[in-house]
Each structure stands twice: as C-alpha cells, then as structure tokens.
Amino acid sequence: MKFLPIIIFYLFLFLYSVEFLSFSFVEIDSINHFPFLKNILHLSSDLFGKNDYALRFPSLFTGFLSVVIFYNIAKLKLKTKREIIYTTYIFMLIPGMIISSVIVNKSVYLIFLSLLFIYSYEKFRNFSYILLILYVFVDKSLISLYLALIFYSIYKRDTKLLIFSLILLAFNANYFEYKIHGRPKGYFLDLFGTYFLIFSPFIFVYFLYALYKNIFYKKDLIYFISATAFFVSLILSFRQKIKIDDYAPYTLGFVVNMVNVFLKSYKVRLPRFRTFYKILFVVLFTSLIMLDISLFFNKYTPAKKLSYSFYFPKNLAEILKKEKIYSMSCNNEKLSEILEFYGIKKGDKYKLIYSKNKNSVSIFHKNKIILKINVSKLNTI
C-alpha cells in the first residue's frame, strides 16, 4: 500500500498525457538524438500499436520506477518512515520529474540510470561497477557521472575507483566524440531560468543553499553527482548554450540531501524555536504544488512559446480527417512525421504550409488555399 499514491499519481499522468498532449517537435528531436529512446519506442509500438498509449507508457513507467528507487535510497539516508514517505512525494512532485515523465525525452531515463547506480553502489557494489561499464554506451551525458566519480574517489581516497572512472570517462568521451564547442557567449541566466522551472523557484534557491550547507557535512555520492552536474553545466553556460537534459537529471537525486539539511537544522532546535522552519516548509511545498498545477493548466494560458507544439498537432490531424484529408505533403519535416503518426500519410494531392512565426497552418489543393488554421487557437480546443 505504500506505493499506492505513487501508482495513482502516475496513472493520472498517463491518462492526462494521452488525452491532452500531442506528439511534438521537441520529442521528435529527442528521439533523433537518443538512439536508446528510439529502440524503446519501437518495442513499445510493437507491443501496444502505434498510438499515444505506446508513445507515453515507456517514459511514465520509467518515471514510476525512478520514484520507487528513490524511495529505497531515502530509506538508506533518512531515519523515520514519515520522513522517507514525504521526501519521496517531494521528489515525485518536482516539476522536472513530472515533465520528464510525461514528455518523450531522455531525461527520465538518465534519472532512472543515475538513481539505479546510486542505490546499487550502496547495496550491491559489484553490480554497480557492471552498470558503469554498460552506461558508457548509453549517452554522452553520462560523462558527468564519471566525472563525479573521479571527484568522489579522490575524496574517499579510493585509487581503484579513481582509475576505473578515468578509464570509463575516456571511453565514453571517445565513443560519443564529446566536444566543447560554440563561441564564447553567456547563457548563465538562461540556465538559471531553466533550473527555476525544473525545481520551482523557491525549491531551487533551497537547492543552492543545501549544496553550500552540505559542504560542512559528510559528503556522499549523491552530493558529488548532483554538484558536479550542476557546476559543470554552470561553467559551460558561460561559453555556450547547453542542453539541460544532459545535466539536470543528475541533480534531482539531491532532493534527499536537501531534506536531510532541512531536518538537521530543524531537529537541533527546541520546539518553540522551530516556527521559522515550519513556515519555510509550507512556503517551499506550496510553491512546488502551485508550479505543478500551472504545468497541467499550461494548455489554457495565452502564451505557450515553450509548449505550443505539445497541443496542436493531434488536434490538427483530427481536423484534417474531418475534412477527409488523409494524405499530404508538408513543408516541415517534423510536423510531417507527427501527422503521419496520427494517420495522415505523405502524398501529393494536398499541401500543408506551416508558418511558425504566424502560428498558422494553410492547406492547399491544386495551388488554391482551401483551409487556414490558427495554431494558437487549436491549443485551447
């Protein structure tokens, strides 16, 4: 029964994503740049057919497994059952965790892999080394994990782990031809804005505070993984625009350390001096819930620059089918792939012109426009 609320929450996310979200441009990019994800989706399509259920299930199931593993990590780090349960719920409700679970992207898989390694390292040390070897071939972003292990092994004075991590880092960097590129240009504020969205503003501020405060406590593997990923992304942002899904997934596990920092400050004080921390918890948790709610109602907001493509393609396909248009050519390859997913095949009889700047779609037949649709209005159907 302890996992029942988690099951209910992820069932809600599954039904929500199938009902309201469309296969999007962002997800097309994610699939094309992460072969591992493409293979998973092919397997899901073979099992469930080519539909939204098959599209959303793998990410959401992986998200659910990540929460379960996090719960087991929390059991190793916290003392009471109440602390463990609340910490797990906080992790589950982090906006970045929700977003990565409902959207087809690599983030949720990286969260799962990092948490699986952390738990394995604590409980099944030899198995964790096997995981590290396998991770070399998964994605280039795992270089952050290997770099964190180098720092951790130096801190623990573990020569064998240091050499092992250096070798795996070299293999990973070589296999994916890891490069630092781009002209020097500051994306520092953009990065911070993204982290604000991932954690929620107040939680992210506390994340920074906990990173600092954890320096004075005994540092564990979670601290090194989260701190390394965060500071590497920070340093690189001064030079180039980074892909946040290469770094942010490794920071979410730090939630358990954030709670530990909070509890240590709370418990050392007498009951009459704990009022500030009770208020702080209410403020942090309320801000988290409010941002979560805004995510689900995002479809109905006037400006959707970040998320507009998650809503209109499915509705567009339905409109085309009502107009008895089942095949067409399209000036946008990504939109063409999405429409094909929803049953609109490629053909020459009709032509679709998509204008991102004007938020419009125009349908032509024999060089004559027969239908024009405002994409922004499709978002609120």
Residue ranges and their predicted role:
Residues 99-107:
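Short acidic/glycine- and proline-prone juxtamembrane loop motifs at membrane-interface regions
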Residues 87-92:
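Short helix- or helix-capping micro-motifs
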Residues 57-77:
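Transmembrane-helix motifs of polytopic, lipid-linked glycan transferases
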